[in-house]
Each structure stands twice: as structure tokens, then as C-alpha cells.
From Swiss-Prot:
Protein name: 4-deoxy-L-threo-5-hexosulose-uronate ketol-isomerase
Cofactor: Zn(2+)
Pathway: Glycan metabolism; pectin degradation; 2-dehydro-3-deoxy-D-gluconate from pectin: step 4/5
GO molecular function: 4-deoxy-L-threo-5-hexosulose-uronate ketol-isomerase activity; zinc ion binding
Keywords tagged on the record: Isomerase, Metal-binding, Zinc
Ligand binding (Zn(2+)): 196, 198, 203, 245
InterPro entries xrefs: KduI, KduI/IolB_isomerase, KduI_N, RmlC-like_jellyroll, RmlC_Cupin_sf
Amino acid sequence: MDVRQSIHSAHAKTLDTQGLRNEFLVEKVFVADEYTMVYSHIDRIIVGGIMPVTKTVSVGGEVGKQLGVSYFLERRELGVINIGGAGTITVGGQCYEIGHRDALYVGKGAKEVVFASIDTATPAKFYYNCAPAHTTYPTKKVTPDEVSPVTLGDNLTSNRRTINKYFVPDVLETCQLSMGLTELAPGNLWNTMPCHTHERRMEVYFYFNMDDDACVFHMMGQPQETRHIVMHNEQAVISPSWSIHSGVGTKAYTFIWGMVGENQVFDDMDHVAVKDLR
């Protein structure tokens, strides 16, 4: 488990390129037949990936010991979105088939969660966010057909994109975790511009569906002290509440956003005018 400490905005603005990457970038999300796990002190979110290839991968008691509990989800909820081939997730003996871009919410109290791929030639890639939970909500599968896509932006401003809200109150109940998937239309490069912050939530972006020769310049920092982190395919970045989170790519891309914090009101954000950015 890779533990990341919280960081003050006044400290963050003094960091060089490598310093910013050390604090906020999750460089390796998927490793064959293993789970990766980054624990952030910011709202206690855990971020990572699970890619079973030649065997199943389970997450249970061994992780619990690192969290000071008996098992991983004793006091946590889990959100998973599969960006790879078809797979299965077994929760408490019940097996869920999770296809490409299907998702599974796992409620607090699930003692063991087992991940598997259907075809080793095209393994599943389970990206997950995990947050503290105060009560148990039912485990539920969510498919792309069950989300309500919202298309925003314009080709003229190069930010035409479709937002798919997987784990939001309109779809299912969670304690605090919200997750969704945003896909840019071909030829569009910008996400979340004009940008915003949200004082009551932190957020993690996971960029994927990118060619090897492509990258995204992820914008972060306070609106008057912006910085950037260069992101490549299948990498994640942690965004504190005080930071903007936006990006521009060399080609179109897709990203998963996950938020935890005080509320789940999607529109509870502090907008920043482009003219006010520095």
C-alpha cells in the first residue's frame, strides 16, 4: 500500500515537476495478477486497479490488517468500473458478470471480494475507488444502459464530451462515494474547462483510452497558482479540495472521476472563470 499524505496548497505551489508527481500522480494502476492500492490521507480515499490474468485476485483480510480492521471493507464501501475485457466479481459467494464499462458497487461489510477475467487474452481491468462508510447499502451492478448520459461542451471550444454518472444518488445509494466516466468526442481535447473547485469534496481522475504517443496535461493547483502534471495512459491523479482539476490532451481520451467528501451534490462546485486563471 502506497500512502500519500495530505498537503497544504502553500506547500504544493513550491514543488518542482517531480515533487508534484510524487504527491499527486498514481503512475502504475494495473499490474498483472495483482491489485494496486494508493491510500490518500485526503478524505481517506483508496485508489487502485485489479487485473487478473492467469489467476483470480482477492482483496480481503490481508488488506484489513493494514487498515487496522479485520478485512478490507469492514468500514468501507467500494466502487469498481471495468475498462478491460469481460470479468467477474464475487462478493460474499455471489458472482457478478462485469463486462466492458460495467460497474459494481460493493457495500460496507463484504468480507472478501474476488476478481477474475473471462478470457486471459483480453483480461478485465477493474479500476476502483474505496471510501469510508458509516452504513451498509446493497451491492449493485450498474451497466452503461442504466446511467443517464449528459453531453456538454462544443466542438468549437474543443470540449464536447459525454458524462456518464454511474454512482450518484439518482442511480443508487452510497455513503459518500460518487463515480462516473467522461468520454471526449473525437477531435476534442479539453475536459472540465471552464474549471472549478469544490470545497466539500476531493476528487481523483483516472485517464485511459489513450494511444502510447498521446498524453494529457492535467491542470491542478489553486486557480491563481496553476500547475500541470503530464499524464499517460491508465494513470490517475489526486485532486485536493483546493485544487482545480482539468486537462487538455494531444488526442481525445476518456477518464473516470471519483469523489468523496461531505456531500454528493454534483453541482456543488465553485466555478472559476477562464479570465481569472493564472
